[in-house]
Amino acid sequence: MYLMLNHDVWIYVRCANNDPRIAFDRLYDLIDEAAGHGFLVRGTSFDHCSGNTLKDRIGLRTMLDAVENGRVEAVLVRDLEQISRNSYILVGVIEILRQNDVYLITTECDLNAELINSGLERFVGDRFTRASFGKPRFDVRLPLMDQF
């Protein structure tokens, strides 16, 4: 189980496919995941767009507003590509989470491996906690980024 029972989370989904059913299915899956692990879902948002741009990312902006206003303690996504496929954008979002002391929780990937594969592990360090069930899942408190 995750280490953050009864903590406030925001769920974010991005879907490049124009079929809204895919985004809603992903959103409902994450809501079920959050409920099953005792998270308190304080908000959800999603975008139908490419993961390589910030254009038309109203859902991402809404999530970041919740983070910056202290309304959540964690952001729940399937994987890092939900945030962005562009490393520059991803690092910027991770920095905002870090500055606000917000956890990033992924449900469909090994976050540590994903950060290493994307070359971003040097930006976020190695403070990962393995969940105790199913396939490897991680939640991470992002440490200071010393350089870009």
Q: Where do the language-model regions lie?
A:
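Short, structured surface patches at the beginning of a domain
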Residues: 1-148
